A protein has these predicted regions:
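Nucleic-acid processing machinery
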Residues: 1-163
Length: 163
């Protein structure tokens, strides 16, 4: 169990950053493939969906390592958001459709449904967060190259879906 007030050493911080820098190209590939698949999923039914995906910036990773070190002693292997995607759609029905697509095509490691939130304007919005991994059949369904499949492997990504 990590000590509550433990701080990461300079050497360990540097090692974690260097390790992530080595893995960064794999997460760039992951983001590219993930965005492409989400775009294909949304293209016909709701082409106005806004989709973005990216790997976590090295500077953001470095900051998070320090901030979360008491909980994560091996961040490069424990963080689940080193690749992230966001899908923004216009209606709750579209959120549900994207949600079904994600559940049908990815292994869900973790799911956090923020539920129907009411803002000051009284319009409801849904905010879903998933930690996912690619399933092997998803690779073949979307013609992901063997090279990209190898780069992605069993890495995890965070996918947010919201209105």
């Amino acid at each position: 169990m990590p000590e509550k007030d433990a701080m990461i050493s300079f050497e360990e911080h540097k090692r974690q950053i260097e390790e992530y820098q080595k893995l960064f190209p794999f997460y760039q590939t992951y983001a590219k493939v993930l965005k492409g698949i989400l775009e294909k999923a949304c293209k016909t039914s709701f082409p106005e969906a806004f989709i973005q995906a990216r790997p976590k910036a090295v500077s953001s990773f470095a900051e998070k390592v320090v901030r979360k070190y008491t909980k994560y002693r091996d961040p490069v292997n424990q963080f689940t958001d080193l690749c992230g995607a966001r899908v923004i759609v216009q209606t709750l029905e579209q959120v549900e459709a994207v949600k079904l697509f994600i559940k049908a095509n990815f292994k869900i490691v973790e799911e956090d449904e923020k539920g129907l939130q009411l803002g000051e304007d009284k319009f409801g919005y849904r905010d879903m967060h998933y930690i996912v991994q690619f399933r092997p059949d998803t690779f073949s369904l979307f013609d992901v190259t063997p090279e990209d499949q190898a780069a992605i492997g069993e890495r995890k990504a965070e996918v947010q879906v919201r209105t």
